[in-house]
């Protein structure tokens, strides 16, 4: 029932191929996976154990892609991945442009993990450090504006890469004591810790228009039912790995979104590109967030708090 999962990728073959094995199982079930490859040493970096040199993160991404390509679901559907690399990884230039070539990483969305430090360097037209993840030492300096322009130009031409703002998502991390957020599900809706799943649902906003007005009572009722439903999904879902089952049940994350906003605007005769449309979106999302929180609180009266409550930011409020 879960749409996607996040798997960790550490800088050793056991970790890489363990995640590949899990990814194959997940793809077979029709779900997607998210990976952050930033811990892998850069291309041509030394491998002391075999007196050789690393092939770099992109070579392993191609292996993940090839395995996924072979797992056909009824001959029609394959799994999908999100591949992420930090903007300060030495191989960032190759990563940004890799999908500009045809038939490369066709089963991957890719995104650059961007930091506030990098964006400050872009704004000030300064260089920034590219860091070897194995040694944590500076490999070379690079123009932040050059890399940022490359990201924008390539995204405009090919649709990839996207960007993920690491500092922002970790500012909103509900369980920072359990680890930092550095990956998302395959379409980027939800930042997740290793082995967490994206348990997602959407409310069709087109259905809350009654007599040419937004029916907030209907929306409230829908939000509360959806929160209850998504929490039930956590217990009903079959999980591909023991690690996933453990952390999903411990954190009980869900993702509530919306669809049909353009249809809602049409019914209300509001132009999509208007200030009124922006205000309507802000009002709706604020209402949904408030009622989702209220619904979650109501669930605790029946089901108590989630097991990792003591490790969360909510325990301090």
Language-model region placement:
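A glycine-rich phosphate-binding loop feature that marks nucleotide/adenosyl-phosphate handling sites
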Residues: 37-43, 84-92, 115, 135-138, ...
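Inter-helical turn/loop segments and adjacent helix faces that build the functional surface
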Residues: 13, 47, 71-83, 102-105, ...
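Glycine- and Gly-Pro-enriched alpha-helical subdomains that act as flexible
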Residues: 51-66, 93
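Polar, glycine-rich mid-to-C-terminal structural blocks
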Residues: 97-158
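Internal maturation/activation junctions in enzymes
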Residues: 1, 20, 222-245, 249, ...
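Function-dense linear segments that define catalytic or interfacial modules
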Residues: 1-2, 6-49, 57-60, 71, ...
């Amino acid at each position: 029932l879960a749409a996607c999962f996040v798997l960790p990728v550490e800088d050793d073959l056991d970790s890489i191929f363990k995640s590949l094995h899990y990814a194959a199982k997940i793809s077979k079930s029709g779900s997607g996976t998210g990976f952050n490859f930033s811990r892998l040493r850069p291309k041509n970096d030394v491998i002391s154990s075999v007196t050789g040199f690393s092939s770099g993160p992109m070579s392993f991404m191609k292996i993940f892609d090839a395995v996924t390509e072979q797992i056909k679901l009824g001959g029609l559907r394959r799994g999908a991945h999100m591949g992420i690399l930090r903007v300060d990884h030495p191989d960032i230039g190759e990563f940004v442009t890799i999908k500009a070539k045809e038939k490369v990483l066709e089963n991957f969305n890719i995104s650059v993990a961007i930091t506030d430090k990098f964006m400050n360097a872009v704004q000030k037209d300064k260089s920034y450090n590219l860091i070897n993840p194995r040694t944590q030492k500076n490999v070379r300096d690079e123009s932040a504006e050059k890399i940022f322009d490359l990201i924008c130009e390539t995204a405009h031409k090919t649709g990839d890469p996207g960007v993920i703002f690491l500092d922002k998502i970790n500012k909103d991390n509900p369980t920072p004591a359990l680890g930092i957020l550095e990956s998302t599900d395959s379409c980027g809706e939800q930042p997740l810790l290793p082995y967490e799943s994206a348990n997602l649902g959407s409310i069709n906003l087109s259905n809350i228009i009654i007599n040419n007005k937004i029916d907030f009572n209907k929306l409230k009722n829908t939000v509360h039912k959806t929160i209850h439903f998504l929490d039930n999904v956590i217990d009903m879902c079959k999980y591909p790995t023991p690690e996933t089952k453990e952390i999903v049940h411990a954190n009980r994350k869900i993702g509530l979104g919306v669809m049909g906003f353009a249809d809602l605007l049409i019914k209300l005769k509001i132009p999509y590109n208007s200030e009124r449309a922006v205000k309507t979106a802000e009002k709706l999302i604020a209402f949904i967030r408030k009622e989702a929180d209220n619904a979650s609180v109501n669930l605790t009266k029946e089901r108590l708090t989630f097991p990792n409550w003591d490790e969360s930011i909510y325990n301090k409020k």
